Amino acid sequence: MLRHSLRSASKLQSKNVRLLRAAPLLLKRSLSNDPKEVFTKLTDENDPQRDAFFKYGWGSWLKNDKQEKEKRVTRFSIEGLNKVLSDLHEQSAQADKTAKTDAVPPPSYNPNLTVSLPHNVTSKHLGTPKRGESVRVVSMASFHEGKHHRIYKIDTNAGKSFVLRIPYGIDEENTLAYRVKSEVATMDFADLKLGMNVPKVFCFGVNALNPIRQPFILEEYVPGRLLMKDWMPLASDSADGSHKEKLNSVIQPISEFQAKLAETEFTAFGSLYFAKDYRESNEPAYKSDTDGDLADRWRIGPSVERCFWRKKSALPFEQRKQYLGPWTISQPLDIVKSLGSLEAENARARLAIKQADASPEAEIDEQVLRDQITAFENLAKLAPVMYNLKTKSIPNMDAIVKPRLCHPDLDPMNVILHEENGKPYLLDFEGTTVKPFILHNNPQFVAYDGPKIYDLERDVENYSKLNAQEKDQYEFMYKRTRNQYLWESQLNQNAKHLISSIAPLVKLLRSPYVYAVQRKYDQEYLLIDEALVQLKEVWELFAKNELTNSEQFPVEFTEEWLRQHAEKLNAYHEKLIAEPFSATQGWMPQDLFDNLVKSGVLVKDANGDHSLKQ
């Protein structure tokens, strides 16, 4: 996710500004309250002063810390960045000389293996250096280290700032290339077709063969503050109802983004690409008689939804590709089947590598992989009968199975309020895909699948007689219920024809799929199994109401399997409680890690790994 750091670099003092004029480049890290400043020479590619600027420092892992951090080093060529910026300025100068038309020019595939968007590459957006000067970078700040990429703020002598996004090299080259191509095309679509406030993309590269020597996206820097600063999810209710206004001040703009994204009905399921980046199809991404040059600008290609790419290195890319789509508009549930089949095949490949003693995953349990195969095969079996696509029991069924954009990161941490006009900007589009709206889930910042409490006094027996700790637990459930209700109320207001997608029974039917999409860690396959078990218990009711077109649940569970499943699920939950960092695979923020080491809570072993002191 693209985040603007809450602790941005402090402004330079006057003496540093004078040094800046004398020095070719200033590097700043802003990951602490005391940002460090380092000067480097542009002509010295191997300057050791630069090393810390590229290293990962946002957090640490209890195990394999060195290896995990090495995967996230984002060393790139600063000299190459200057060349890319210079090339963009040359393109803008040429564009200023050519005749102006209303037509939006197609992306420019440049000889240096970058792609630029000419309609954004203008002197207005890029700035103009002083007469006689060539454009160059004068300072860079390490702005944020996210889950999937690093964010740098770039300042130039042309008076403009930019954001440079470098994805971590965790995934292999094909994965990164598809992700970057699709994200830029989706942001372009949101800007040109939907008129949304998003950062303008100037240039991107999909591999390390460009001058920057890394896959990258160079885009507009949007100054402002994060919407997250206004989000108070556990705020208590106020007598005058003002708490709803405060909560809705965050929920409403994000809901409006969702409604805008869902506005267009596409011609297939998958993800957006520029036409030249997906030549396997000649069909436009959507049908239009009025959009002219825009209608043929994009295509629907393979899905870049994270679940289709996460930890799939055990499978060769060509083997994976058959499961990635695009999928025909007449078969909306094939997405679910493909995901189940891909995950099962991936688990088989990992198991084979493990059994051959060739697996880099030392701690993975073979039985866990076998159980995963079964769980995902069961999900694939469920897919064809998951919904009755012709049912009259679900209002507007035709509308909610149409292909619509699904943004996986609708979150106040991904929205910035522009400092000049207060308008919300949606920053990051990584992993955005086109799928049936009935398969979209509520955003994580409001999602809640626990017990629903709408009124504490009415829904909780003897609430007033409970002790303080018990009241706190119920109040937490109430506030989570309240926040989700406010979100769903906004959906009803902004896209009423799609509201049936969040009906409780509709949610329950898609729950195994949602857990598969959101799965990050190996043992979370147990949540898919549990959702299937719960679904089987009420399947007869669904069949009677024609919500599904199969009277028989497609999966059978033996009593022995159910017993073992309950034991494994309980053990997993106990592990989460006993090992506080197991849910993050041993990762923790750097400040916390340093404090725990300093206080002796974390101890280091002979292998360099850390554990909690017993």
Curated annotation (Swiss-Prot):
Pfam families linked: APH
Location of the transit peptide in the chain: 1-38
Top-level taxon: Eukaryota
UniProt entry tagged with the keyword Signal: no
Gene Ontology cellular-component annotations: mitochondrion
Bias type Polar residues, positions: 110-125
Record key words, sorted: Mitochondrion, Transit peptide
Keyword DNA damage tagged: no
Coiled-coil region list: none
Family: Belongs to the AIM9 family.
Name this protein carries in UniProt: Altered inheritance of mitochondria protein 9, mitochondrial
Origin species: Eremothecium gossypii (strain ATCC 10895 / CBS 109.51 / FGSC 9923 / NRRL Y-1056)
